[in-house]
Regions:
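Membrane-proximal basic amphipathic "stem/tether" segments
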Residues: 1-22
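Conserved small/polar residues in nucleotide/adenosyl-binding loops
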Residues: 172-173
């Protein structure tokens, strides 16, 4: 299997897992308005994936620019950036918690993440909050994260490749 064939295979898995969940207009939050090249590539992959859907992005923003006091219609889906910031290593994770608290009636999808907690009490706090949200889907991008989430969280948990695999292969041939 060539590299391009493997990327195509991973992209197909992403589309099969996520496309059925995004069935309405959406907002995309938690964007990386900071200098982490990997997170910027994930964002580019998310945008490429979303362009293929028949729904409209109503708003996008980072943890620093998103207005979480704004009313969002209940049928609007909230998408949160993927990457490696699920857990207690990065303060930015608190933004996810605020979104989940502020929008209990919206479908929320956390794009593929790596999960890591240094302190068990922080994970227990997240389990308590997130498990109460009836429309939250959390995507893991690696087996370990998937197993941690599946074992501890009561939400829908999916194993989905990193969204950077949705970047068109033609980008690499510039």
């Amino acid at each position: 299997m060539t590299c391009e064939e493997k990327i195509w295979e991973l992209r197909q898995i992403i589309e099969e897992q996520l496309t059925p969940l995004i069935n309405n207009d959406y907002v995309l939050y938690d964007l990386p308005y900071y200098s982490n090249i990997g997170d910027l590539l994930i964002w580019e992959g998310e945008l490429s994936f979303l362009k293929g859907l028949p729904f409209k992005m109503l708003e996008c923003g980072s943890a620093f620019t998103s207005n979480l006091k704004r009313k969002i219609k209940k049928d609007t889906i909230i998408l949160l950036q993927g990457g490696g910031n699920f857990g207690d290593i990065w303060d930015i994770h608190e933004f996810k918690r605020k979104v989940i608290r502020n929008y209990p009636e919206n479908r929320i999808i956390i794009f593929p993440q790596t999960v890591f907690y240094q302190k068990n009490e922080n994970m227990l706090r997240d389990i308590e909050l997130m498990s109460r949200h009836p429309y939250l889907t959390i995507c893991a991008r690696d087996i370990h994260s998937f197993e941690v989430l599946k074992k501890n969280f009561k939400n829908t948990i999916l194993l989905v490749p990193d969204m950077a695999f949705c970047i068109p292969v033609s980008y690499t041939h510039l």
